[in-house]
């Protein structure tokens, strides 16, 4: 029986023997295609080749492409684990012809691979094919050339309401390349329900599509008509998981070798005996998607691809919770996955530690809110009407407890409950509007500035130029002229001003004529033109005026030094922290540089010092900074660092600082690194889960910061009546003194608490003959509460004590039970239940337990609940 890895390799070997170049899988984050959330088909990396925008050195290719369908238009997430064949991650085997062979060879190749004794050797009588209704050519090849009997060939017409809309007609979009396709189905046998393609029972598990062969032979025009392509092409896809199920004689993909290995590993970790449990299938699927997304540069976050990853991780964690997981477990599956994936798992092995760290951090973070969120959901589900959960509850789970909507839907699905998604969207829209109204963005000139021209940027090598005013905008509309005192956006035919891009802020400076002075505060790019934003200081400016544009040189040089420093910083971060570091954002201004990057753990002080040393070493070496333009493929071969999600053209600008740093960049840079002067890191912090931020200063700003730090040290030493060298010792002495004073203060507090305890003993009530004291207190800290409880237990010998104290907007809870009563009332259990009422948690021994909370407004209700609960136990 062939393994998944063997089937994958057989496919590549077969097509390689037919003259196809084996092309590695592209990343799950599509390169140069911001329209696509994730790579979801084998043809994605060849899209520009099919469109004629890119040429490759081969006309035949074959791949084993990793794909994700979760989020966006292609979203299988909610079905994963509940069906035999839905996955978030899958591998698509493909063979492609770029104007080379066409229908005859494509069909022959597929049939030979499937049925030849040398390859998969499937029984021919088990295979059925579909063709587009009018594609007589494909029908004849299958019937007359290959020899498939007519009863095994099914014509499928337009079945989606419009012409050329069919399961057997493929299109790249509303216009562009399209054509008929032929699909191959495998018959799993009469023991499975289902009918042939085109019948009412086609969605059953008997006849399963295993291969789709698309014939790109037309170009759909805007009017819907089809024109023949001069060079027809072929795009095919064979689902590896489905074919493995066929070859291993099982009907469900989850019964194949890779999934069974993962399912058994999860079952072992969580001590689950039932290997058919749906949650095991969910987790086995999700570890594949999460691991490969992380290795391809995605990190958990609250937006875009990162949020899809977060949703998948949290769904897996919730299913682990259903199976009884008490601690982080998901990350432990990575080594098993890397091993079982064979050659496709090698990239996981290389970054195994990073993948596990990322998963564990996210898993532990969600675990903190999972239990409380599930409790809220369980309570809400008991109150639903018409089997519908309100969108308000779903939104609260999303907004407060981090529950993605599909995770809430997952729980509801198990109770046959649906979510009112319309009211959920109303809540989401309201939140977006709140965020929008609280932002500081001004007028959106992108919708206003529409100029049928292009501004030529000439500012890499000069700071001033003569140019022509080609457009003016003021108060959100186009104007012909602006006067003194008016704010405006000036568009020039050429400019030395750099417009904000790639994290680098826009230039400022002056635009002047003999009769006008216009102060430029910022420069932005609107489409293909540069907008110089500012105010007329004197005179007037009109369209057609010839002006002198002068950049603020000192400011530009400071910005430039900071931009070059970010490149050195990026390389130093990768050296010290690891190759997983990827830039996630930046700000390069004249005053500071800010750099966001992928990293799950905080950067230690020692690591920050090493990073700073490395950058300053490169500055002292005064490295030459080279700038070259080259095609994108050559840049990749040089090891150039590019940014995920950025779209690059065929020709790119490469900024190099010897071999220490090579990056694609359109910004301005120093000629030699020595011009940066000095580099000083001033902060490190978290921006979001999995993203850290550092801020740094260079040149004069760095020197001024160091002078200020030195001033603070001297002033502190003077205040403490010591010198700078003895300052730390002096602080240690003061800390010791404070500790002694605090200890003495606590002693007095305990005395006062004991006196208060004596008074509280008078507040005892009887519940079924048992002494009970339940009191709300003010300003008593947890240590003193414990003393008070101990005193009461000593005084009354048999008692149940519950205290809730509000101190500094927080709730301190304590439950004490004398040992003779702890078999009836468990202090740890009771304090945990009370804590839930005040937004907290806690626990402890049967005779003494403590907890905290963040919702003091609910303390009265919580104490009333405690009284009722005690009554029920006694």
Swiss-Prot record:
Q: Which reaction does it catalyse?
A: tRNA(Ala) + L-alanine + ATP = L-alanyl-tRNA(Ala) + AMP + diphosphate
Report the principal subcellular site.
Answer: cytoplasm
Is-annotated flag, keyword Disulfide bond?
Answer: no
CC annotations in GO? cytosol
One molecular function GO term is: aminoacyl-tRNA deacylase activity
Assigned EC number: 6.1.1.7
Entry note: cofactor: Binds 1 zinc ion per subunit.
Q: List the cofactors.
A: Zn(2+)
Q: Where in the cell is it found?
A: Cytoplasm
Under SUPFAM superfamilies, the record lists: Class II aaRS and biotin synthetases, Putative anticodon-binding domain of alanyl-tRNA synthetase (AlaRS), ThrRS/AlaRS common domain, Translation proteins
Q: Which key words tag this protein in UniProt?
A: Aminoacyl-tRNA synthetase, ATP-binding, Cytoplasm, Ligase, Metal-binding, Nucleotide-binding, Protein biosynthesis, RNA-binding, tRNA-binding, Zinc
Its Gene Ontology biological processes? alanyl-tRNA aminoacylation; negative regulation of DNA-templated transcription
Which enzyme type, at the first EC level? ligase
Summarize where Zn(2+) binds, as residue positions.
563, 567, 665, 669
| Function text | Catalyzes the attachment of alanine to tRNA(Ala) in a two-step reaction: alanine is first activated by ATP to form Ala-AMP and then transferred to the acceptor end of tRNA(Ala). Also edits incorrectly charged Ser-tRNA(Ala) and Gly-tRNA(Ala) via its editing domain.
Q: Give the comment on domains.
A: Consists of three domains; the N-terminal catalytic domain, the editing domain and the C-terminal C-Ala domain. The editing domain removes incorrectly charged amino acids, while the C-Ala domain, along with tRNA(Ala), serves as a bridge to cooperatively bring together the editing and aminoacylation centers thus stimulating deacylation of misacylated tRNAs.
In the record, the note on similarity to other proteins reads: Belongs to the class-II aminoacyl-tRNA synthetase family.
Q: What is this protein called?
A: Alanine--tRNA ligase
Give the organism, scientific name: Haemophilus ducreyi (strain 35000HP / ATCC 700724)
- The record's gene field reads alaS
């Amino acid at each position: 029986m062939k393994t998944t890895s063997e089937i994958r390799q057989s496919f590549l070997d077969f097509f390689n023997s037919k003259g196809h170049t084996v092309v590695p899988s592209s990343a799950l984050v599509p390169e140069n295609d911001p329209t696509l959330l994730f790579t979801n088909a084998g043809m994605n990396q060849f899209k520009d080749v099919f469109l004629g925008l890119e040429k490759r050195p081969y006309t035949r290719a074959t791949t084993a492409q990793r794909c994700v369908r979760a989020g966006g238009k292609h979203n299988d997430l909610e079905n994963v684990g509940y069906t035999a064949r839905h996955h978030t991650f899958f591998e698509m085997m493909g063979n492609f012809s770029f104007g080379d062979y066409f229908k005859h060879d494509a069909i022959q190749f597929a049939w030979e691979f499937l049925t030849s004794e040398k390859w998969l050797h499937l029984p021919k009588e088990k295979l059925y094919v579909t063709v587009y209704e009018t594609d007589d050519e494909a029908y004849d090849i299958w019937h007359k050339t290959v020899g498939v009997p007519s009863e095994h060939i099914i014509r499928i017409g337009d079945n989606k309401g419009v012409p050329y809309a069919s399961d057997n007609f493929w299109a790249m979009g509303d216009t562009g390349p399209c054509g008929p396709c032929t699909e191959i189905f495998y018959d799993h046998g009469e023991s499975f329900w289902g009918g042939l393609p085109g019948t009412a029972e086609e969605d059953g598990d008997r006849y399963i599509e295993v291969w789709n062969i698309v014939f790109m032979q037309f170009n759909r025009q805007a009017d819907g008509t089809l024109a023949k392509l001069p060079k027809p092409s072929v795009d095919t896809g064979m689902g590896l998981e489905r074919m493995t199920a066929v070859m291993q004689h099982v009907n469900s993909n989850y019964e194949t070798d890779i999934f069974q290995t993962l399912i058994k590993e999860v079952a072992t970790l969580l001590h689950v005996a039932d290997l058919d449990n749906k949650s095991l299938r969910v987790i086995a699927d999700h570890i594949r998607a999460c691991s490969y997304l992380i290795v391809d540069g995605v990190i958990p976050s609250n937006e875009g691809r990162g949020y899809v990853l977060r949703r998948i991780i949290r769904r897996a964690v919730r299913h682990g919770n259903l199976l009884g997981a008490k601690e982080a477990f998901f990350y432990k599956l990575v080594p098993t996955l890397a091993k079982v994936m064979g050659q496709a798992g090698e990239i996981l092995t290389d970054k195994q530690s990073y993948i596990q760290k990322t998963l564990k951090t996210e898993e532990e973070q969600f675990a903190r809110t999972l239990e409380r969120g599930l409790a809220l959901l369980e309570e809400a589900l008991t109150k639903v009407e018409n089997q519908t959960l309100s969108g308000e509850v779903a939104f609260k789970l999303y907004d407060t407890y981090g529950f993605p909507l599909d995770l809430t839907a997952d729980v509801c699905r198990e109770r046959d409950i649906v979510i009112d998604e319309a009211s959920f969207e109303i809540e989401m829209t309201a939140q977006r509007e709140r965020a929008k109204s609280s932002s500081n963005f001004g007028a959106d000139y992108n919708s206003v500035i529409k100029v049928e021209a292009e501004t030529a940027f000439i500012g890499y090598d000069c700071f001033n130029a003569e140019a022509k005013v080609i457009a003016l905008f003021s108060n959100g509309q186009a104007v012909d002229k602006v006067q003194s005192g008016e704010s405006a956006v000036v568009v020039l035919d050429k400019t030395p001003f750099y417009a904000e891009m790639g994290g680098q802020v826009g230039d400022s400076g002056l635009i002047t004529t003999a009769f006008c002075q216009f102060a430029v505060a910022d420069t932005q790019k609107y489409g293909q033109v540069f907008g110089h934003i500012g105010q007329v200081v004197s005179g007037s400016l009109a369209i057609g005026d010839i002006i002198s544009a002068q950049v603020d040189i000192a400011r530009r040089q400071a910005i430039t030094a900071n931009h070059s420093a970010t490149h050195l910083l990026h390389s130093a971060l990768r050296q010290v922290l690891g190759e997983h570091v990827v830039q996630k954002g930046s700000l390069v201004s004249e005053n500071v540089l800010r750099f966001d990057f992928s990293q799950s753990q905080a950067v230690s002080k020692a690591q920050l010092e090493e990073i700073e040393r490395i950058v300053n070493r490169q500055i002292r070496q005064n490295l030459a900074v080279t700038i070259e333009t080259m095609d994108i493929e050559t840049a990749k071969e040089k090891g150039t660092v590019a940014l995920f999600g950025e779209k690059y053209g065929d020709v790119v600008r490469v900024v190099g600082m010897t071999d220490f740093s090579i990056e694609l960049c359109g910004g301005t840079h120093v000629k030699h690194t020595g011009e940066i002067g000095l580099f000083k890191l001033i902060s490190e912090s978290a921006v979001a889960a999995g993203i850290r931020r550092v801020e740094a200063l260079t040149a004069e700003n760095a020197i001024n910061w160091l002078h200020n730090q030195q001033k603070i040290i001297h002033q502190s030493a003077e205040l403490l009546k010591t010198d700078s060298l003895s300052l730390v010792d002096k602080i240690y002495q003061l800390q010791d003194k404070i500790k002694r004073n605090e200890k003495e203060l606590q002693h007095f507090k305990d005395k006062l608490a004991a006196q208060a305890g004596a008074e509280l003993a008078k507040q005892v009530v009887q519940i079924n003959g048992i002494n009970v004291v339940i009191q709300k207190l003010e300003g008593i800290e947890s240590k003193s509460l414990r003393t008070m409880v101990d005193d009461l237990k000593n005084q009354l010998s048999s008692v149940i004590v519950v205290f809730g104290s509000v101190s500094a907007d927080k709730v301190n809870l304590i439950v004490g039970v004398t040992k003779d009563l702890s078999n009836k009332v468990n202090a740890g259990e009771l304090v945990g239940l009370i804590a839930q009422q005040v937004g907290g948690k806690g626990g402890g021994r049967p005779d003494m337990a403590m907890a905290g909370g963040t919702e003091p407004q609910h303390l009265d209700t919580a104490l009333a609940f405690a009284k009722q609960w005690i009554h029920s136990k006694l």
